[in-house]
Amino acid sequence: GRFRFCSLHLHLLDPARLPLALEALDAGMGVMAISPADKGGRLQAPSPLLQADCQPWEPLALAYRYLLAAGVSTLTVGASSPCDLNLAASMASSDGALTPAEQTALSRLELLRQQRLGETLCHQCRACLPCPKEVPIPELLRLRNLRLAHDLQEFTEERYNLIGRAGHWWEEVNAEGCETCGDCLPRCPHQLAIPDLLAET
């Protein structure tokens, strides 16, 4: 093929792109996970709730293992100080299959997410798009998922407040752009009340 390598946003708490990464790996391509710590929910400074949910592991360590065990070739660390490299160095050869204990922790994390969000969980299938008003429905509901399921309030508020102010690399329209036209409703396979959820966001 033409490509030998790709970079993707791959995160423990937002695994929507992992199937694409696995396809690339199956095709013999290298895959780099972009900012699995910071953009994945600022896992280097997790909420107490997320810390409790991931026990006995730190959320960042579990996130790195999740990606490495899937075969992801490279993780960008984004260190702000030398000590931030300690965890990465300790996990440099931790690319084997998940242990039963790690699998249990990941399953528990997913179960807790589903319990907390219930029938309002957005599965990030993107069937709701395109929105006539260009509201980035999946991204906004992803932030909602992270806030309510894992109490990542500081991270989600920061990301939301960057909408329309970050240039080409982030969204331009926030939830206020929704005019409740209902165009997205029949396309959602989970029957989410999308305009209502956006209003909460």
Name every feature range the model reports, one short phrase each.
Residues 122-131, 178-184, 188:
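Short cysteine clusters
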Residues 1-144, 149-163, 168-170, 196:
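Beta/alpha (TIM)-barrel catalytic core signal, keyed to glycine-rich beta->alpha loops juxtaposed to Asp/Glu
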Residues 169-183, 191-195:
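Iron-sulfur-cluster electron-transfer modules
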